[in-house]
Amino acid sequence: MKKILAGACLFGLLLSACTPAAEPGDDGTLHILATTYPVYLFTTAVAEGAEDVEVSLLVNQPTSCLHDYTLTVSDMRAIEKADVLVMNGAGLEDFMGDALAASDAAVIDCSEGIELLPALGHEGHDHDTEYDPHIWMCEESALVMMNNILHGLGALDEKNLDCYRENAAAAAALVPEDDARMENLACPYLITFHDGFQYFALDNGLNLLKSIEEEE
């Protein structure tokens, strides 16, 4: 469990996501497709050991900005095959477009219940999203994401509800305590090379001075 969660920052339990019922695929397996790597980490943590459940990652290739991502043929096939789509939400998956609209899969939106920050604008980037979608960078928001997945999967797959609950509780127990080092920084300012650290800065009492993009 710790190995699965190590790369994701922070997690836990808090709100629920309401989604329609999902039916297992023809092979009797509930195919869950997580759109991004952080969402995949959270989903695999909750679903680990669940019977007849398979979790896959949609965007499994490096990309600096998902707003510029284009679905491949294999991506579209994965979406078509999925019984459940677990999404970051907050506009991050705008690239899915018509493929999402055509999907019959149940959808779990991890951003439900999270207070979103306005998106940071940068010259040369035409981001259509109104809000900053990098919600997993904040401990509290990551906890909500985990709980949304727990309740979403539990509603869709009651057979594995106890497993989901146990896994989510174990994940919550791994959430680290507040880092005192962040409270005593002599220079609590942050300059980053990506515009995804707003939530991290707010969560740790840092002042985000500048987000430098490669084009700059």
Which positions does each model-derived feature cover?
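Extracytoplasmic metal-acquisition and chelation regions
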Residues: G7, A17-E216
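Sec-dependent bacterial lipoprotein signal peptides
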Residues: M1-S16
